């Protein structure tokens, strides 16, 4: 049985494995990485901008002049947040040099594990595209931001990328009987790393604590959305009653009669009359 990769303990255990990280980055970005350091919960001191960010996994490869960030999306994150993360890493490079020459390429890879009704895509790549006046592209900035969503994998998904999307999806949806491409040695290794029985007692405890906390936050967000919908419906009902009141006012109907017909207060009807 697999442990779910939408849990940060399991997620970090998998993607901090050097072999897994190298294969995954190669399959998604095409880049070779040989990290000198692999950090978790990476932050920058002092913080860049007004937000003190934490990056799930941060790998630095000075040989290939490459930095790779990997982030798991929690329920409350959105695309703009990770654009900020991506730019923060670039800005950190600038802060660490005397001049503005960056010297390294930054790739940020974001895992979205929930369904996205707006962008139903398996892989979205965002890059800084520079175009000259004649229409020619100029490769000024190599940095890229990748969004992966296993819910929208298909036959058109590149096979190597699909293997990783299926691993994440199956660990969440079918952990007891996952359907994976175990013909690939690296996928077999990845599967072994996230076997539920292979978690240490400490990893298991932290994973359960985190899941409980995130479930609590998700319930709070759901409650907030429901309250927002109720407020929206109530506001819509009131606006409809106001429209009726305006029409009756235009016909010269008395305030008391309008109040009885719409349920609006006489004071509000008086404001509508003045407005």
Model-derived features: positions:
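Short, charged alpha-helical interaction segments and adjacent helix-coil junctions
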Residues: 1-5, 9, 62, 66-71, ...
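C-terminal segments that line or cap access tunnels to active or ligand-binding sites in enzymes
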Residues: 143-156, 167-171
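Accessory alpha/beta interaction modules
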Residues: 1-144, 154
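Generic structural signal for hydrophobic core residues of well-folded globular domains
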Residues: 14, 28, 112, 151, ...
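Active-site cofactor/cluster-binding pocket
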Residues: 134, 151, 230
């Amino acid at each position: 049985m697999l442990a779910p990769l939408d849990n940060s303990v399991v997620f970090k255990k998998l993607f901090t494995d050097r072999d897994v990280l190298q294969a995954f980055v190669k399959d998604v970005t095409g880049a070779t990485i040989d990290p000198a350091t692999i950090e978790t919960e990476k932050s920058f001191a002092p913080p860049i901008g007004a937000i003190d960010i934490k990056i799930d996994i941060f790998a630095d490869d000075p040989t290939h002049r490459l930095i790779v960030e990997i982030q798991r999306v929690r329920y409350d994150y959105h695309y703009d947040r990770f654009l900020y993360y991506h730019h923060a890493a670039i800005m950190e490079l600038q802060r660490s040099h005397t001049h503005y020459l960056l010297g390294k390429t930054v790739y940020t890879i974001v895992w979205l594990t929930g369904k996205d009704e707006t962008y139903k895509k398996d892989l979205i790549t965002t890059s800084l595209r520079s175009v000259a006046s004649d229409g020619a592209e100029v490769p000024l900035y190599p940095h890229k931001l990748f969004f992966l969503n296993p819910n929208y994998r298909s036959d058109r998904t590149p096979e190597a990328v699909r293997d990783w999307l299926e691993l994440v999806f199956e660990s969440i949806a079918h952990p007891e009987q996952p359907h994976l491409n175990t013909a690939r040695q690296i996928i077999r290794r990845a599967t072994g790393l996230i076997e539920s029985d292979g978690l240490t007692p400490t990893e298991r405890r932290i994973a359960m604590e985190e899941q409980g906390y995130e479930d609590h936050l998700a319930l709070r967000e759901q409650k907030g959305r429901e309250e927002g919908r109720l407020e929206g419906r109530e506001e819509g009902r009131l606006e409809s009653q106001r429209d009726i009141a305006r029409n009756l006012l235009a016909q010269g109907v008395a305030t008391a009669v309008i109040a009885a017909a719409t349920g609006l207060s006489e004071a509000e009807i008086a404001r509508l009359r003045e407005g």
